[in-house]
From Swiss-Prot:
Family recorded in the similarity comment: Belongs to the DMRL synthase family.
Protein name: 6,7-dimethyl-8-ribityllumazine synthase
Family annotation (NCBIfam families): lumazine-synth (TIGR00114), PRK00061.1-4 (NF000812)
Record key words, sorted: Riboflavin biosynthesis, Transferase
A Pfam family this chain is assigned to: DMRL_synthase
Catalytic residues identified in the record: 88
GO cellular component, one term: cytosol
GO annotation (BP), single: riboflavin biosynthetic process
Enzyme class at the top of the EC tree: transferase
Lineage: Bacteria, Bacillati, Bacillota, Clostridia, Eubacteriales
Enzyme Commission identifier(s): 2.5.1.78
Residues the record lists as binding (2S)-2-hydroxy-3-oxobutyl phosphate: 85-86, 127
Biological source species: Clostridium perfringens (strain ATCC 13124 / DSM 756 / JCM 1290 / NCIMB 6125 / NCTC 8237 / Type A)
Keyword Transferase found: yes
Functional note: Catalyzes the formation of 6,7-dimethyl-8-ribityllumazine by condensation of 5-amino-6-(D-ribitylamino)uracil with 3,4-dihydroxy-2-butanone 4-phosphate. This is the penultimate step in the biosynthesis of riboflavin.
């Protein structure tokens, strides 16, 4: 039996981050986490591009454009959607999730879901580097691993 898996060596790979500006004070912490993960695993700063979009809903389109460019081993999507008093949260979360998954499937480039979806601001803060780790860091790690796995198949 042959086991296929990726490693966490990011050297000589280029990655893109797409970040939603809405709730920027949280998203900036997610970006910091992603950059930390990339740096710790050998990705040079010059091999990371960051694209800002207005909010989470706009992330899939830019992620698709970046993935289709052929320049990147992976694309990390970072944003924050916090539940409010209306059903808007449910629509945004559902469509962004589907959009990001479809981009990855359509382009065969790892497009990683690093969107923090929470019930309240406290939960979002926890997932941006306090109690619950940093989901940006986790997303960058997944991008590195998936990029290497795809190379091994």
């Amino acid at each position: 039996m042959r086991i296929l898996e990726g490693n966490l060596i990011g050297q000589d790979k280029k990655f893109a981050i797409v970040a939603g500006r809405f709730n920027e004070f949280i998203v900036s912490k997610l970006i910091d986490g992603a950059l930390d993960a990339f740096k710790r695993h050998g990705v040079e700063e010059d091999n990371i591009d960051l694209a800002w979009v207005p909010g989470a809903f706009e992330i899939p389109l830019i992620a698709k454009k970046l993935a289709k460019s052929g320049k990147y081993a992976g694309v990390v999507c970072l944003g924050t959607v916090i539940r409010g008093a209306t059903s808007h949260y449910d629509y945004v979360c559902g469509e962004v999730s589907k959009g990001i998954a479809n981009v990855s499937l359509d382009t065969e480039v790892p497009v990683i879901f690093g969107i923090v979806t929470t019930e309240n601001i406290e939960q979002a803060i926890e997932r941006a580097g306090t109690k619950a780790g940093n989901k940006g860091f986790d997303a960058a790690m997944a991008a590195i691993e998936m990029a290497n796995l795809l190379e091994n198949i």
